UniProtKB/Swiss-Prot annotation:
GO terms for cellular component: glyoxysome. This is Isocitrate lyase. It comes from Oryza sativa subsp. japonica (Rice). Mg(2+) binds at residue 175. The keyword Metal-binding applies. The keyword DNA repair does not apply. Its cofactor is Mg(2+). It catalyses: D-threo-isocitrate = glyoxylate + succinate. The active site is at 213 (proton acceptor).
Length: 572
């Protein structure tokens, strides 16, 4: 007879540590930070996926700071306003005036990919492109923070009292595009973002294969359930790493015209179908295939597709039923009653599946209705989709339990759309925080707004709950504008153009890059050298002979100001 198994003490200790970690994760999830967060997995699942060596991440601290910032804005009815930072100079300048930083995939795609190959925003660059830019900017933030500390702690208390402190460590929110593939790709992307310094990440509900800039045509959505899986994958990775990275869920449902699949019932009400029975058994894909076999191409194929779509009379199933009710042989009062019953039974928030909708229609006397969502599918197999704010609301409600902030991409700065989305989402998720893209793709001057309207736009939208508002590409446009106008003037007027447009403007506005050696940290590394060499260095960069001494005096030329006045401005 075998003796009973004795569990070694090391095994018991291992299990004890594991169970303690499970309890720790459960307690963490029970904090106010995750009060609104839903997870389809357990704390034990997270602990099983962690290693034994606990790591900490600077981005974790920045994520907590970002969360506090956004919640404060939510409580105050205000918004964090920011824009896409292009480089370390911009991120350092932004720190003086803004409380968050954005890193745009569009800007990275056009200016800073991992392969150095520029292009439009199709998310076809290597997936470490945006994380690399995050690290580029985060390292700059850390450096300027160190540099400032050395400078301030080398001053007297009286000097520090007159020198404004700049918080260079502003939380970075980064563009995660569509997650760059399946769940494992999203997990690895989010891990990179945490390691590189991102405090927040946004993921959008477009197909990763056909991803487009939110202001381009041809956008293809994934099913609601697929994007929920992306958000869950991101949250799981953040949980594994023990960070509170802010997760932003973006939907492109307002302007999307296609969707990958009809598998999710929440999408059914927005999918378009052919209503012309003459096209029965003549799908668009088959017609185009036959035309290509006959040698048609280019404009001829486009003309064939346009004609087919016009003949098909595409409608949502709900619109098709409404038209059928209007055509019934019944009194106007009876028709109105049936329309009201249909609207009540199939409202957007109910997300009624197609088969159930057919049963409801039949109960109202609408039978033998021809409506086919497969006939108009594209050659790639995509379904036709009617984008709308209502579709965005349905998706926002589905994403809310899995994300911290919700973002509806729009095609214009439309207060009515902002209001409808905010009210629709917050009816189901009252505590939801919202984001808004103050896009440079909008022609703001053609929006019908006055200058006063534009000035008030951010505060007005903030009062609706949009706590984070950002101009995605302002860094790009500012860089282009300054460079183009200066280059043109420099070609014409030479050094006077530089002095007037750059040097004097830096001086009069107190921009510290006027003394670029100091700004870049020459004094900081002189301190390093002197520390290494016992307090002295004959090769100090800012020693006797440095040309920046010229900027410490007074100027009497045109456009000049005294150094004391410049210093005062720099401290404002």
């Amino acid at each position: 007879m075998s003796s009973p198994f004795s569990v070694p003490s090391l095994i018991m200790e291992e299990e004890g540590r594991f169970e303690a970690e499970v309890a720790e994760v459960e307690a963490w999830w029970g904090t106010d930070r995750f009060r609104l967060t839903k997870r389809p997995y357990t704390a034990r699942d997270v602990a099983l996926l962690r290693g034994t060596l606990r790591q900490s991440y600077a981005s974790g601290d920045m994520a907590k700071k970002l969360w506090r910032t956004l919640r404060a804005h939510q409580a105050n009815g205000t918004a964090s306003r920011t824009f896409g930072a292009l480089d370390p100079v911009q991120v350092a300048m932004m720190a003086k005036h803004l409380d968050t930083v954005y890193v745009s995939g569009w800007q990275c795609s056009s200016t800073h990919t991992s392969t150095n190959e520029p292009g439009p925003d199709l998310a076809d660059y290597p997936y470490d492109t945006v994380p690399n830019k995050v690290e580029h900017l985060f390292f700059a933030q850390l450096y300027h923070d160190r540099k400032q500390r050395e400078a301030r702690m080398s001053m007297s208390r009286a000097e520090r009292a007159h020198e404004p402190y700049v918080d260079y460590l502003k939380p970075i929110i980064a563009d995660g595009d569509t997650g760059f593939g399946g769940a494992t790709a999203t997990v690895k992307l989010c891990k990179l973002f945490v390691e590189r310094g991102a405090a927040g990440v946004h993921l959008e509900d477009q197909s990763s294969v056909t991803k487009k800039c939110g202001h381009m045509a041809g956008k293809v959505l994934v099913a609601v359930s697929e994007h929920v899986n992306r958000l869950v994958a991101a949250r799981l990775q953040f949980d594994i790493m023990g960070v509170e990275t802010v997760l932003v869920a973006r939907t492109d449902a307002v302007a999307a015209t296609l969707i990958q699949t009809n598998v999710d019932a929440r999408d059914h009400q927005f999918i378009l179908g052919a209503t012309n029975p003459r096209l029965r058994n003549r799908s668009l894909a088959a017609v185009l295939s036959d035309a290509m076999s006959a040698g048609k191409n280019g404009r001829e194929l486009q003309a064939i597709e346009d004609e087919w779509l016009a003949t098909a009379q595409l409608k949502t199933f709900s619109d098709c039923v409404r038209d059928a009710i209007a055509s019934l042989n019944a009194t106007d009062a009876d028709k109105q009653r049936k329309l009201q019953e249909w609207s009540a039974a199939t409202s957007h928030d109910k997300c009624v599946p197609l088969e159930q909708a057919r049963d409801i229609a039949a109960g109202l006397g609408v039978t033998s209705l021809f409506w086919d969502w497969d006939l108009p599918r594209t050659r790639e197999g995509f379904y036709r989709f009617r984008g709308s704010v209502a579709a965005a609301v349905v998706r926002g409600r589905a994403f809310a339990p899995h994300a911290d902030v919700l973002w509806m991409e729009t095609s214009s700065p439309n207060i009515a759309e902002c209001t409808a989305f905010a009210e629709g989402v917050r009816a189901a998720s009252p505590g939801a925080m919202l984001a808004y893209n103050l896009s440079p793709s909008f022609n703001w001057d053609a929006s019908g707004m006055t200058d006063a309207d534009m000035s008030e736009f951010i505060p007005r939208v903030a009062r609706l709950g949009y706590v984070w508002q950002f101009i995605t590409l302002a860094g790009f446009h500012a860089d282009a504008l300054v460079t183009d106008t200066f280059a043109r003037d420099f070609a014409r007027r030479g050094m006077l153009a530089y002095v007037e447009r750059i040097q004097r403007e830096e001086r009069s506005n107190g921009v510290e890059t006027l003394q670029h050696q100091k700004w870049s940290g020459a004094n900081f590394y002189d301190r390093v050298l002197k520390t290494v060499q016992g307090g002295i260095s004959s090769t100090a960069a800012m020693g006797k002979g440095v040309t920046e001494e010229q900027f410490k005096g007074s100027w009497t030329g045109p456009g000049s100001e005294s150094s004391s006045h410049v210093l005062a401005k720099s401290r404002m």
